[in-house]
Amino acid sequence: FVVNVIEDIVRRYDVDAIHMDDYFYPYPVGNTPFPDEYAYRKSGSHLSKDDWRRSNVDSIIKDINIAIKKTKPYVKFGISPFSVWRNLKDDTQGSDSKAGITNFDNLYADILLWLRKGWIDYVTPQLYREINDPLIAYEKLVDWWSAHSFGRHVYIGHGIYRAYEKNVNWKDPNQLPNQIKIVRK
């Protein structure tokens, strides 16, 4: 269904790109498991449930890319994922971060696979953190995503809305200008 809708949009409208924000499994809610046990068992998959979930997401990303490129090869396809693919402690390719949730492990989105396979033309990681954040440092993630783009475009997503928060780092009027300087280096 989703692939057909996107193909229809690309065919009928003069769009430059299809941009998907947060396309993967829902963010975890406490200890409540995602209710897909029946679908997993019915699938008969020999994959672990985590790998099966990633495979489901991978399949639709690949199919969307194929539909877009078949219809109008010049239309771009991009994703705006959560800021952390995986933590370094869990994977040697991961970022130097201490995120409680990651794309790969909790949202079942293997962004690096999509970039490497060319299924997406660009990535817009949601780097809604502050510079020197002790858990997920903005500047480290800018460098990490740039180094793991596989030749695809990287457009950093800024958390401008955070300027209104009470967090002391976001009260600094130079936080966003300094982030922009980091991205431009």
Label the model's feature ranges.
Residues F1-W119:
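Polysaccharide-binding and catalytic clefts of secreted carbohydrate-active enzymes
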Residues I64-I68, W145, S149, V183:
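Hydrophobic, Leu/Ile/Phe/Ala-enriched alpha-helical segments that form helix-helix packing faces
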Residues Y74-A99, L141-Q179:
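Active-site clefts of carbohydrate-active enzymes
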Residues Y108-P134, H148-K185:
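Substrate-binding cleft of secreted/luminal carbohydrate-active enzymes
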Residues D133-V142:
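Active-site-adjacent beta->alpha loops and helix N-cap segments on the catalytic face
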